[in-house]
Amino acid sequence: MELMYLEYAANGFYLLAVFLAARNSIHTWWLGIIGCLLFAALFYQVKLYAEVLLMLFFVVTNGIGWYQWGRQSGVKQVTNTPLWRLAGYSALAALVTLLYGYILHSMTDAYAPFIDSAILMFSVIAQFLLMNRKLETWWFWLVVNTVAVPLYFSRELQLTAIVYIGFWFNAWYGLYLWRALRSAAARGA
């Protein structure tokens, strides 16, 4: 598939999946699987190997998230993650970023291996938080999208970079909506 068409298709599916995640919709997961498979092919072609690994990880976690959200009935509760746990996740992600970035730098022709690795690791945390409906997922997505946009522009993936700017705004939207869901649940509504 030509790179441009692959980029359009990947972004189309993924854009809808990310929007539906902010809306707390189960359909985020199957659309995400399709988008991630398309993005894996795209990122492989532009030598963003940590992004390929991330997309394959997302395929698996989208399947798990789809299953988890599908077996829950009624209102899906949004909760918080303890600060100490977030600090631990962040420290672990930083350490693995350095290690994996070094491996990519030393053993492959990867482009921007440390930045690519940081996107990978902090996206992993964000994805697990999303799967468990933790409010803080949106803060991690804000960081990931902030770092990813210039990387994608640097690889001439303009459409992807622009879509990730949209994801950045969607993360703010998701944060707003999920705060409202959490507050409504706390009030017993």
Describe the role of every protein-language-model region.
Residues 29, 48, 128-131:
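Alpha-helical interaction segments
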Residues 1-24, 69-73, 80-189:
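Polytopic alpha-helical membrane-helix bundles and their juxtamembrane interface segments
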